[in-house]
Amino acid sequence: MPLHGRHQAENITLAIAAVEAFFGSERPVPEEVLDEGLGQLTSPGRLQLIGNDPVIYVDSAHNPHGARALVEAVTESFNFEELALVVGVMSEKDASGVLRALAPIAHHVTVTPVSSPRSLDSDLLSELAHDAIPGTPIDVADSLPEALDHARAWAGAAEGRAVLVVGSVLLAGEAIAFSRSEGWGIA
């Protein structure tokens, strides 16, 4: 299964159970159909690889629960020595809760606005990040491209580092589109 995290496995298990319940026990789903379908499965914006050199992932986790699941998935699935987070959050979301949940994997953070009038102000997000992730370097960027430049430079300065863009579904989409426009060739 090409997805990361226990929560994704649980979601797939529930989906298979729903299909089996719909068709009934007299029409089981053939194993080869499941294998083929799961082998082609993608979940855009969920630990999606969008760049290499350095490695850059994007995830649309935008609440504390999703951020905790993301931290668990990153910890279980990857062996990054250090991770730079690019974080943008919408004003109506629990930014402090998201940042606290991300703290265990945050070695460097660049906050950025989301391209939306509902975006949380970057300076406020920076203050929240300093409180939620004490002792971690926090940068403020005026845009996602600037934030990615900061994070990529930091991650490229040492082996074992990577970048993770997180905090908003809109930010995830923006990062995927930006990676395509830059010709990173993955997303």
Protein language model features and the residues they cover:
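Nucleotide phosphate-binding/pyrophosphate-handling subdomain across enzymes
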Residues: 1-108
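S-adenosylmethionine-dependent methyltransferases
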Residues: 19, 183-187
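Short helix-capping segments at alpha-helix termini
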Residues: 26, 78-82, 130-135, 183-184
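C-terminal helical cap/extension that packs against the catalytic core
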Residues: 55-57, 64, 99-162
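Solvent-exposed interhelical
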Residues: 165
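Active-site-proximal loop/hinge segments that shape catalytic or ion-binding/gating pockets
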Residues: 168
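RNase H-like, metal-dependent nuclease domains and their acidic two-metal-ion catalytic environment used
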Residues: 172
